[in-house]
């Protein structure tokens, strides 16, 4: 049975400056080995929501429970062992002189032995394919690779939950596909992954559930297929489904409306609706 990792109970948050209501009455449960997508327009509350998961923000009302810990009673440093946050811009996260040193910082702060620190560093280098970059300065490598280093730095902390803020922003196609595979591998290792993203292809092809935010409220919690097929929801949130999904819903060649999430699904649908002629 899936283990509950994060539970939000009637969560509300008001920013003191300007008394802006950022979250209102959010109820949500996220379990082990789920891949979750969080979407919504700017200002909808999605970033405010996930910053409660690692204690960067504290509830104004309600509760957030992370692996049995009430976040209101825990310091950010304590929650870092449970939830790792990878920022959208790696420049806000990286500071060491080499990739190796960057990957050693987190586990060293956890008080691990030198042997354990080196073991975690080497595991991260292997997992993220950073062998040729270990002695490079993080700011002297490309932006896409820098984002992988920032993910690897969080990986060395071994959190149960990873929060990835726009993980494919600024990535080329090759590195984007690498990120997709890494997210799947994190799940295979037992992690829960939460992606705050505008990348609809990532959400369609990789995540299990989509959390849709609008005007400080959680308005939908469903599979990508259910969310992308809800035209009223898409319209009200000003979100555009992946192009292949829009084609499937509109193209009469399939014989019926198809909620397609990938090109592979489109190929299968086309082949099944147009069987080869008998020779």
What residue spans do the PLM features occupy?
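A short, flexible loop at the N-terminus of ABC-type nucleotide-binding domains that lies
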Residues: 2-8, 13-25, 73-75
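Helix-to-loop junction immediately C-terminal to a conserved catalytic motif
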Residues: 54
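Conserved ABC transporter NBD signature motif
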Residues: 62-70, 79
